[in-house]
């Protein structure tokens, strides 16, 4: 055990120097400068972003005391790494999942404007979910599954 410890002590100066070098090589980000025309265009897209997405209104979460045969639980992994869960009725439209994910995405306006897609993962495979499908959670096979949100 002492050999491992002495080896780590000998390597520590190199690790510290490498991390400082990497930190100094990182590019300093400067804020973008926009002209007045570009800023007007971004304001127009910001106002219409909700209309473009057109997600349905998200109803309240069903009570967990309800019959479990009519409920399904969905776990969603967000792009920032968080995992969130919500219950839906199996008879509800899958489109509500997009509304739920959109409501959980960060508060920054830049993230709110970004388009995303939903992916259901299987061992060794995955399935893209499409907003246009009018299927229910039960019909789509999403009941009690994990869905990932990824940026387009």
Swiss-Prot record:
<dbReference type="InterPro" id="IPR050730">
    <property type="entry name" value="UBX_domain-protein"/>
</dbReference>
<dbReference type="InterPro" id="IPR001012">
    <property type="entry name" value="UBX_dom"/>
</dbReference>
<feature type="region of interest" description="Disordered">
    <location>
        <begin position="32"/>
        <end position="61"/>
    </location>
</feature>
<feature type="domain" description="UBX">
    <location>
        <begin position="67"/>
        <end position="150"/>
    </location>
</feature>
<protein>
    <recommendedName>
        <fullName>Plant UBX domain-containing protein 12</fullName>
    </recommendedName>
</protein>
<dbReference type="InterPro" id="IPR029071">
    <property type="entry name" value="Ubiquitin-like_domsf"/>
</dbReference>
<keyword id="KW-0833">Ubl conjugation pathway</keyword>
<dbReference type="Pfam" id="PF00789">
    <property type="entry name" value="UBX"/>
</dbReference>
